[in-house]
Amino acid sequence: EIVLAMDYIVRSGMALYWGTSEWSAQELEEAHKVCREWKCVEPIVEQPQYNMLKRERVEKEYLPIYDKYGMGLTVWSPLNAGILTGKYNKGIPKGSRLDLFKDNGGLKGNIDEAGGLNEKTLEKVRKLTKISDDLGVKTAQVALAWVLKNEHVSSAILGVSKIEQLRENIETLKVKSKLTDDVMKEINSIFE
């Protein structure tokens, strides 16, 4: 049903392409199989959560999908609800997202699923902050640049609450070149 509906939408000119969100590799395989059998428009993008703390699906499960179907990724939560910005390294600041939405089960669930806000996670982020400081950039910029260095990531969905955060996020495009192979190895050794 989904394949037929999306095929109709694209062929009718209501959309140029279609994609999926949080589908498993098996579901993507099935969708492409149906599309090819029925000569329907295939999905071109998947929207998974992806960040330094949540990597398994993007880096392992989807590996056969990228080349086989030419799919890209539009990832969400590249900063894992702000944890990868470094702002929680010394506790939860007053007025921060985790302070304001501490009773939000969905937000808490996403954080817990990616390792949680605990000392082990915070120690990793503190090490990332040290790398960022050595590069002369913000921790959030390094975390975003790391996501964008993945050749399968077409774009990252960002959420900001302040204009300065948006500016810093845009500046990430200049930071990406600072993540040399050696820096990437150092980061990956922290978050493996």
Which sequence ranges carry the predicted segments?
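Beta/alpha (TIM)-barrel catalytic core signal, keyed to glycine-rich beta->alpha loops juxtaposed to Asp/Glu
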Residues: 1-192
